[in-house]
Amino acid sequence: DVVSFERLAYKVFEEVGEDNLEVLDDTGKNLIIKRVLEQNKDRLKYFGSNLSNTGFVSEMKSVISEMLQYDIKPDVMQDAAGAAYSDSEGSAALQYKLDDIVLVYNAFAEYIDKNYITKEEILDKLCSKVTESERIKNCEIVFDGFTGFTPVQYNLMTILLLMCPKIYVSLTIDASERENSVRGREELFFMSKDCVSKLYKICDEEHVKVLEPVYIAGKVVPGKNVIVNVNSRFKNSEELDFLEQNLFRNNSGRFNKKTDNIVIYEGAVAKEELTFAAGEIIRLTRLCGYRYNEIAIVTADMDGYGKLAANILKQNDIPYFLDYKRHVTDNPFIAAINGALGIIENNYSYDSILGFLRTGMSGMEREDIDLLDNYCVAVGIRGRGKWHEPWIRKFRGTVNNTDLEKLNSLRTMITDMLDPLEEVLKSKESNVADMVKALYEFLVREDMEQKVSVLNDSEYTGDEYAQLYKKVIEVLDKMYALLGSEKVGIKEFNKILASGFQEIKIGLIPQTNDCVVIGDIERTRLDNIKVMFFVGI
């Protein structure tokens, strides 16, 4: 089997009868962290004023996730906070930040205790159960594609070293390097060497025999056990092979031949870079026999280059796939949900009502929205009371009885839409489960799934909108399951829901196999690429 650490854990849990775990994902963590932040906001020394900042909950979630992943306990952070305080040159702000992180971490852990585990804790659980697995005891395990391991992963590997007949670890390192000699973080292969050093230390402490390292290289290296691989990936490109051998090396050489496989182009702006890339792609596919799926555009700045690259390729009729998961809080559907809740929270303020109507999800025609807008401004319609009583006032003789009849019809359309939701959200008897159910019924009543399914604009495709509706329902399901019995006000309910929406990301799969991939230099995995454009360097 080829599995990730997480998938290995689930296979072991299934074998040993530990497969009923409730695992908390990032959205669930966001929801709970937002709740505990609101509960403890008066106790926060530093972050109290940050609670309403966009992205703050996700940042706090990331900190807690890293603490879990690297097995950093709250008492370690508490000691660090104390050290910051006792240091004469220490920062009080740093101490307060660490104190706040510990407070939120402990509150989060207490909330999920005995009911859920986070995905970062899955390997901890695996460490306690893997020795019960008969299947693992007879396995030879190969760890491939890693540059290093987290402390929890090293703990698991320690257990596996004592259980399994053989374990292989493949790492990237030059055959001329000393694999167990770590001089500094600035070394080219520091991460691989550091990993080897830690594994050697574990083997030494556990009295595990280490076999002679095997290198796969393009040539024999004296004193090393080398398997010579003559089928180098750069066998047809002398300059790329030279670049690999000399890039970031202390004693790098100079390539004095003509370079056919490396081209440097400088554009004044991003659009110029990408226009050049598009022209080259057209030339390569039409004149040189390349397929689109053999070409990729890679950048470290997907926000600045991804969408622009997609637009330029589209203009040139070049099929592409944008490998990019993005946040979706800036679309009409999310805006409509926030708008409807905002109307109730803000007592039918002018801005909240018009903001909701302008999303295009209310079912009201644009001309009717303009008519409402003009009347509300001219007559001064403000507050829930005004919206729940008949409008009879005319202004400047421009509104006749027919217009008033139309306006009142539009008024009742809005109040009838929101009243059932408002009744539940403002009831002192309602808990989060009741509020989530009322919001879901609002979405169903207003046929939001159908409205979302026909959306397709310059920002999002129809397929992305289809994903979005399902993701929103998943957030509601998680709120219902994780926070259902909690009692909160409408303001806090809206904040918790917004924190869940912040974690929603959508992405697509390629519509065709033959397309240019536009991807991130860290995230995107590329296979069988023959031409690569690095942009935004």
Ranges and model annotations:
Residues D1-I537:
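Polyanion-engaging groove/track-forming segments
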